[in-house]
């Protein structure tokens, strides 16, 4: 009856990676897609309506995965895409060959995330080497995932 080749374990419910929101409704510290990248809004300003046209919204955002800065200007009445962002905490179990072994709440272990570059990656490796029990916060948006934060595990 069941086809053994079908595996639905990693499927989603067909939810979109983004949803539309009017430019004027966006807020600082919110999220938006700029130049095709999921960004956190760090600066936002509006200009008055001109003789011809609408009020404009000037957005400056930092990519949540690469920390690159992106800017865009759009009319306040237009819709912008806002990324659906999921934030999960996983227990750090092991680090091997540049990949994190992370245990989920249900006991499953995932080993598909790289140790992040920069200071966070060094901090994760140092604290793990010192034997500290840590929770790694993983952000996922638009088909990408990355470890973004580290916190001590509560006893």
From Swiss-Prot:
PROSITE patterns: IF5A_HYPUSINE (PS00302). Its main location: cytoplasm. InterPro entries: IF5A-like, IF5A-like_N, NA-bd_OB-fold, Rib_uL2_dom2, Trans_elong_IF5A_hypusine_site, Transl_elong_IF5A_C, Translation_prot_SH3-like_sf. One of its GO terms (molecular function) is RNA binding. It is found in: Cytoplasm; Nucleus; Endoplasmic reticulum membrane. Lys-51 undergoes hypusination, a unique post-translational modification that consists in the addition of a butylamino group from spermidine to lysine side chain, leading to the formation of the unusual amino acid hypusine. eIF-5As are the only known proteins to undergo this modification, which is essential for their function. GO terms for cellular component: endoplasmic reticulum membrane; nucleus. One of its GO terms (biological process) is positive regulation of translational elongation. Binds to 80S ribosomes. Actively translating ribosomes show mutually exclusive binding of eIF5a (eif5a or eif5a2) and eef2/eEF2. Interacts with dapl1/dap1b; interaction takes place at the polypeptide exit tunnel of hibernating ribosomes and prevents translation. Translation factor that promotes translation elongation and termination, particularly upon ribosome stalling at specific amino acid sequence contexts. Binds between the exit (E) and peptidyl (P) site of the ribosome and promotes rescue of stalled ribosome: specifically required for efficient translation of polyproline-containing peptides as well as other motifs that stall the ribosome. Acts as a ribosome quality control (RQC) cofactor by joining the RQC complex to facilitate peptidyl transfer during CAT tailing step. PANTHER family: TRANSLATION INITIATION FACTOR 5A FAMILY MEMBER. This is Eukaryotic translation initiation factor 5A-1.
């Amino acid at each position: 009856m069941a086809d053994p080749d079908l595996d639905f374990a990693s499927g989603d419910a067909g939810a979109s990676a983004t949803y539309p929101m009017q430019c004027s409704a966006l807020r600082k510290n919110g999220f938006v897609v700029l130049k095709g990248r999921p960004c956190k809004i760090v600066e936002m300003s509006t200009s008055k309506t001109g003789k011809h046209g609408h009020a404009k919204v000037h957005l400056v955002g930092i990519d949540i995965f690469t920390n690159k800065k992106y800017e865009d200007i759009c009319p306040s009445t237009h819709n912008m895409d806002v990324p659906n962002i999921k934030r999960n905490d996983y227990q750090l179990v092991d680090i091997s060959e540049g990949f994190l072994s992370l245990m989920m709440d249900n006991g499953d272990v995932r080993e598909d995330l790289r140790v992040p570059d920069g200071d966070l990656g060094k901090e994760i490796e140092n604290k793990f080497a010192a034997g500290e029990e840590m929770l790694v916060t993983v952000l996922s948006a638009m088909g990408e995932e990355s470890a973004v934060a580290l916190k001590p595990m509560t006893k």
